[in-house]
């Protein structure tokens, strides 16, 4: 599966950074490494790192995968954003 797609979800650089911090927070709370999270959702470790640093946009599909990996609904996933 490719990490990249044309259907990017987040528009502003500031929002990308906030989203990335949320992903990192949830990953650490779940006691997962970037590699473990990447394997769990079928993406590369590099992609997870770039998302967490706010350097890479993502798609709705990947956001669903992330929320499922953290065992959260989308509402819970975005709760503190």
Explain the meaning of each model-derived region.
Residues 28, 43, 59:
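Contiguous, function-dense segments enriched for cysteine-driven chemistry
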Residues 31-50:
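Short alpha-helical DNA-recognition segment
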Residues 55-65, 74:
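Short, basic-rich loop-to-helix N-cap that marks the start of a DNA-contacting helix
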Residues 1-25, 29-30, 35, 68, ...:
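N-terminal flexible/basic segments that precede or flank functional cores
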Residues 44, 55, 81:
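The DNA-recognition helices of helix-turn-helix-type DNA-binding domains
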Residues 71-81:
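Short C-terminal boundary/hinge segments that cap the last helix of small helical domains
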Residues 23, 34, 45, 60-63:
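Helix-turn-helix DNA-binding elements, focusing on the entry/boundary residues of the two helices
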């Amino acid at each position: 599966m490719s990490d990249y797609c044309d259907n990017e979800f987040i528009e502003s650089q500031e929002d990308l950074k906030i989203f990335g911090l949320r992903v990192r927070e949830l990953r650490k709370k779940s006691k997962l490494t970037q590699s473990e999270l990447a394997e769990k959702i079928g993406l590369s470790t590099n992609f997870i790192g770039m998302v967490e640093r706010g350097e890479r946009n993502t798609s709705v599909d990947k956001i669903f995968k992330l929320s499922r990996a953290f065992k959260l609904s989308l509402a819970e996933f975005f709760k503190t954003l």
